[in-house]
UniProtKB/Swiss-Prot annotation:
Entry-linked InterPro entries: AstB_sf, SuccinylArg_d-Hdrlase_AstB
GO molecular function: N-succinylarginine dihydrolase activity
GO annotation, biological process: arginine catabolic process to glutamate; arginine catabolic process to succinate
Enzyme class: hydrolase
Protein name: N-succinylarginine dihydrolase
Amino acid sequence: MNAQEANFDGLVGPTHNYAGLSFGNVASLNNEKSAANPKAAAKQGLRKMKQLADLGFAQGVLPPQERPSLRLLRELGFSGKDADVIAKAAKQAPELLAAASSASAMWTANAATVSPSADTSDGRVHFTPANLCSKLHRAIEHEATRRTLSTLFADPAHFAVHEALTGTPALGDEGAANHTRFCAEYGKPGIEFFVYGRAEYRRGPEPKRFPARQTFEASRAVAHRHGLAEEATVYAQQDPDVIDAGVFHNDVISVGNRDTLFTHERAFVNKQAIYDTLTAALDARGARLNVIEVPEAAVSVNDAVTSYLFNSQLLSRADGSQVLVVPQECRENGNVAAYLDELAAGNGPIHDVLVFDLRESMKNGGGPACLRLRVVLNEAERAAVTSNVWINDTLFTSLDTWIDRHYRDRLAPEDLADPALLEESRTALDELTQILRVGSLYDFQR
């Protein structure tokens, strides 16, 4: 059956701010305590969605999670009415209020790992929400993620939405940011590629400066859950030195699509063995792997991290050609810009480069790839998604005006203590559930 890759982007939430919560994420740390612009952030992401939808790509949207999380703050011992809880947290532990207020669920590449029905043993699309247990502000996301995915992908004949793995360091799971899929065509069986930073029960190299967030054990558990064929599943370790350079997820150093792997030469441990394994596995599935390896001499790891060259979307057009979606920071880095010009002018599979202004997300360490969750759907599966989440002219206009009505254009760290922000966010999200037709998705609606 014909299938298409859909991208479900996270809509940036009303509490988007720069709290520097993500150790190992250089941009996040560098912009700590800056004032953010939630309205601009949401509009930048929405305009990327709309332009890609206009180009014929299947583009969906995922709603923000409720923030600040009063559930977390109450769990941490702050009590009283909602306004009292926020006031106490702001006074006694502002770092915990910042964690409870993070809009990080916007980066849906970390929402879950997704395996299409062509790859799974029961012929359904499988989702495993990521536990994101390495960071408090992200570890609180998986329950709401599961609720959202279960709402959008509700038909059990087509979809299986699992619980997150147990939130322990041995099973640290960061979702699709460390996973990609190679195939001849989206609707045919493919190769699922899992990248991890360390193994809990195997000796091997590990980073020394920043933590490795994804474990081999978590990746293997997800593959087993999804019923993936062993011969069609490949595991690779990310080079610990690039993790220490700020590559906190694999999607900061490589991206894959169909038969193409676009990667930096320093991305992996034992890279040639990985290329050979992927080539053999994909050959058995009827396709030939095309590796585009960017040399350190052309683009350094530091260039890759500051420009987010590899935190890009690699998309296939109907004619089989591929387009690379990059942030504008790639055009502002001389080495990266020169490389992209050469890439687009060459004879390889990537013929075009699209550039987007995602500055607000980028300042927190999230480029085009961070903002989207890839879900391959055949025609019957797409028809089973009945919520109003597919971007078109009407939905774009509704969301754009919704942002204008509800979002602030400035949010500084001290503004998180404003109890009005909670009410503003709830009012906005309550209206959003009606626009997207997702029912009572949030705790405050129940």
